[in-house]
């Protein structure tokens, strides 16, 4: 069954995939490029272990029997050997790809052991870090806590001192304002008394002046009355004198 499938797949009449043979039974570089793959390394430390060396890897089919089967189906010996060489090379490339992309159970166990060793190393480093760095951090935190407590105490003392100073200043200012208000009140009372005294004196002077003015007005009225009488008397005497003179001239004129 296997020989018939290979015959249908590799027959030279074009019914299957056409293969190009190369000398010495090797694949061309263009054909090899399609089967080459790249693998990436892990980030952790790993010791490369090759469980199955290349010389110990065996093919899964009998190449001699396959050559004979191909010869019985119309291939000559050179073509049969070339086809078997190509199949062998393809199998080796496939095995290389499988061994590069996959691991065996033994490789997995070795990798797990390496990972566990790496984790143990990390755990030891963490313990050392906890004993050293964490202790230093704890000491630094305690030191900072003590410094913060000291700063807090200093701030409390400074706040209390400032509050006491402000309270004293407020009391002094209140006393000063009270004294100033008392002095102003005393000065206001004295000014009020002085104003009342001045007002009384002014009223007394005004009253005396008014009395003097009334007296002067009365005396002026009396003087005016007396002057009026004197004037009337003078005018009457003047009139009588003028009449007497006029009568004298009249008599004198009549007699002449």
Curated annotation (Swiss-Prot):
Keywords: Coiled coil, Membrane, Mitochondrion, Transit peptide, Transmembrane, Transmembrane helix
FT transit peptide: 1-42
Top-level division of the source organism's lineage: Eukaryota
TM segment ranges: 231-253
Entry's localization field: Mitochondrion membrane
Cross-referenced InterPro entries: CCDC90-like
A Pfam family annotated for this UniProt entry: CCDC90-like
A cellular component annotation (GO) from this entry: mitochondrial membrane
Bilayer topology annotation: Single-pass membrane protein
Cysteine pairs bridged by disulfides in the record: none
Coiled coil: 129-167
Family recorded in the similarity comment: Belongs to the CCDC90 family.
Quaternary organization: Interacts with MCU.
Protein name: Coiled-coil domain-containing protein 90B, mitochondrial
